[in-house]
């Protein structure tokens, strides 16, 4: 199911689109690395299942897996994201306090439902930064979100300077709200509808504390219990005026420590994961305290370029019906 905006015409031809994609990605990557003190590193496309390093996302998505000839009997998985791998890399590389790493992450999410903003191909900047115990606060999380949002603003400014026909539309500041405050504000709406209404009102929002059970007995959304601390995480969401809908650009958070990992595994009935290598290191306090997240590259491009479909800024696979519908309505997929 996709949305076809009324009278949609992209302001960019296909080669202008490709050039603008490069401008956006280069500008954002450079700015992100500068404001968060990150160094680019190489990262894997796949990991061994037994390590527990793959990201379980919402806990139900199936990774693409295979066996390799020289390691028969060991299951290899295409990554969903690098949330856990990055934290291990910070330890291996000896990264200092308040310094971090980022990588170009490419993944396959086979169970994604295709629409204007979802693809089975995921490209994002995955980043992770070493923090102190005293940084494990909402205030530090919000400070980091503001730094990240400023990178969006600088990237938008660079795009507008290069392509005058492109108009700036992002608000100058981001609005913070917790998932509980959002539920209290709109108690009769579904979590997704709450996001829509609040994002449309504010333009740029960060919803914190996702994964925990709210006073209603429900969750705002599911989160895997073994990477984000559900009290210290959130989603950065911007309003997309072309699709007239909310668009999540980043999911991020302060990561679990020994206590929050144990608590969340218990709540999620996932204590069997304690035997995995990664979880053992965490429970023994052998990994640094960190904050990190993922930032959708194609989503940034489609939003800032005011594209109607993510396939206009990335090459992926779409259903025949979607391809035909897009072609009939002047939406040129790469």
Annotate each language-model stretch with its function.
Residues 2-118, 126-130:
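Class II aminoacyl-tRNA synthetase-like tRNA-binding/catalytic domains
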Residues 19, 23, 27, 136-143, ...:
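Generic recognition of stable, solvent-exposed alpha-helical segments in well-folded globular domains
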Residues 32-39, 148-159, 308:
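A generic secondary-structure signal for well-formed alpha-helical elements
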Residues 41, 50-55, 166-179, 319:
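N-terminal pre-domains immediately preceding structured catalytic cores
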Residues 56, 66-69, 91-97, 117-119, ...:
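A general structural signal for short secondary-structure junctions and capping/turn motifs
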Residues 73, 99, 122, 202, ...:
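Short connector loops at helix/strand junctions that flank enzyme active sites
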Residues 103-189, 193:
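Extended, charged alpha-beta segments that form solvent-exposed binding/catalytic grooves
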Residues 108, 179-334:
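A translation/RNA-centric and nucleic-acid-associated enzymatic feature enriched
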